[in-house]
Amino acid sequence: MVELRVNAGNVKNPNVHKIGIIALGSHLENHGPALPIDTDAKIASHIAFQASLESGAKFLGVIYPAHELKEINHGIHVSLEDLTDEIVKVLKSAKKFLRISSVIIVNGHGGNLPIVTTLYDIEERTGLLITLNSKIIESEGPHGGSGELSMAKALGIIDESQVENQTNLEEYGEVGLYMFGEARRNDPNIEEGALDVEENGVYVDDVYGQELLKLAINSVLLDVEKQLDSHYGY
């Protein structure tokens, strides 16, 4: 068998090759007229890929499906069970072919947050140690709001000619999750985001977008260090 040069390249710790980073977003979901339907997937993929470049960990790509709360209907999503099964399938394949022993899931879609309840099941079924990183969700603000618009500007995926229409909430009620009354009543954070968009509107700031992305990337890099320090599976 060929002996791999695990110390080759800009690699500070050869054990980083045993860590995988994979994006989890949403590919089929409305974000207002200024943002593409796969905004969450593209943002999560950028964060995961950049963290992979900077850390040396393996970039595993992106999970295709996404989950959403039943009271929020702004896209095409799957059940939590189906999402869990898909993650298990993908990670089993990555473990088999890439010899990883732990994974960081970079989550860029709030509707995926319930996956935290199935992480133990995913670990048991894959034999991998899993870290779920949702830093960007914690930082970006309302759905389709200034945070996502600014990151989209930094990534070059925004239609700036449509920003002025982003707060036409009668037509694009998914922005800020404004039109989802039940979700707003059930979750104070959703209600706060909806009111923020309604009362304050949105803006685009390239520097702010870059700062949000860097904050999220650094958070993933910290998770890589934690996995290395804990000697996960090594």
UniProtKB/Swiss-Prot annotation:
The cofactor note reads: Requires one Fe(2+) ion for activity.
**Which GO terms fall under biological process for this protein?**
F420-0 metabolic process; riboflavin biosynthetic process
Q: In which pathway does this enzyme or protein participate? A: Cofactor biosynthesis; coenzyme F420 biosynthesis; Cofactor biosynthesis; riboflavin biosynthesis
Question: Its catalytic activity?
Answer: 2-amino-5-formylamino-6-(5-phospho-D-ribosylamino)pyrimidin-4(3H)-one + H2O = 2,5-diamino-6-(1-D-ribosylamino)pyrimidin-4(3H)-one 5'-phosphate + formate + H(+)
UniProt-annotated binding residues for Fe cation 2: H31, D40
Entry keyword annotation includes Cell division: no
Q: Which UniProt keywords apply?
A: Hydrolase, Iron, Metal-binding, Zinc
Q: Which PANTHER family match?
A: 2-AMINO-5-FORMYLAMINO-6-RIBOSYLAMINOPYRIMIDIN-4(3H)-ONE 5'-MONOPHOSPHATE DEFORMYLASE, 3-DEHYDRO-SCYLLO-INOSOSE HYDROLASE
How is this protein organized at the quaternary level? Homodimer.
Q: What is this protein called?
A: 2-amino-5-formylamino-6-ribosylaminopyrimidin-4(3H)-one 5'-monophosphate deformylase
What organism is recorded for this protein? Methanobrevibacter ruminantium (strain ATCC 35063 / DSM 1093 / JCM 13430 / OCM 146 / M1)
Instruction: Write the gene name.
Output: arfB
